[in-house]
Amino acid sequence: MKILFINLPFSGHIIPTLGLVQELVKRNMKVTYLLTSDWKEKISYTGAEFSEYQDNKKLSVQMKNAYYAAVKLVSDYDLVIYEQFFFLGKHVAEKFNKPAVRIFTSLASNELIMQEFINADGMFGIFRSKWICRQWTKEVAKGIDLKTDCWLKEILYNPPELNLVYTVRNFQPFADDFAEENYKFLGASIYQRALNKSFIMPPKKCPLIYISLGTIVNNTISFYRKCIRAFEHENVQVIMSIGSVVNKDRLGKIPDNFSVYSFVPQLEMLENTDVFITHGGMNSITESLYYGVPMIVIPFITDQPLNAKRIEELQLGKKLMFRKITSEMIRATTLSVMKNPAIHEQVLEMKKEMRSKNANVFGANVIAEYMSKYC
């Protein structure tokens, strides 16, 4: 079987899919992953073939570049797999009468969930205006026969037959809206990744707090300083990942119980972590739950506020609002979560569910079963 995989160049939308690609390649399927050039090394590591479309700072141009590159390739493939926000993926497949599978690296979307994404800060905010959404869609999808007049509606109202979601059904809000025969919930995407030989895990001496705000919103020096003040006199060990933008020297004196890095291999960290302070991206949440780690979620954009809300609803941790946060709030909330038996009990239950399926093996099985109708 030959599979064309199409995605947009955003880390959180790509990283979970690479485990599925590895599994498909392991089964002797030929996978070509269509992405921008800066992802070539990571794609090649999976064993898939890499195919490039031109990157651009404008999302609209990225979409068009990906679409036209895919159209040139797709006739040679048996199946198209695409991530939900590349909304033209189904149209690429239909143009050449190919089956399509859609992947959700965030929560599966219905009207209420999509509205939450739009109302949050981030790149979707501009689409609160229905006129802007229609005009943007018209420009991106010129000459393509859409089912709706807005790309976000296209995600909602023009789904493919099969959808794979990287969380568990019990974490998904409005789960009953997503029919079991069409939406398969995989759990967390945990797979073999390239080793980072430059990182040496410090010996664990006491309860460990891991702090990371992901790859997009990490230029927040004031927040990192508040974390230092929160825990500098506590009997805890803190590992803080600050990204490549912030200069460590600007944080001032680093206490002895802190280790600060520009990058930390997250899965290795979570295996040893007692509480995770996170921005609440879907990957970070599913990975944390896979390792049974409760969270303090400080949401910023798009799906993160809804993810944080869900963490509190399910008693898997606590939410703090970035604009109101103080050192005392960080300290008190983190220590409270660390000692809360009800939260730990719920996290362990969710850990069992996240591990109940090997997400990428299950996903590959579902794809193989689906494609048996076409082969």
Residues covered by each model-derived region:
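A conserved mid-protein helix/loop that constitutes part of the nucleotide-sugar donor-binding site
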Residues: 216-229
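Glycosyltransferase specificity loop/lid
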Residues: 1-129, 137-138, 222, 232-375
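A nucleotide-sugar donor-handling region in carbohydrate enzymes
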Residues: 128-208, 213-216, 242-245
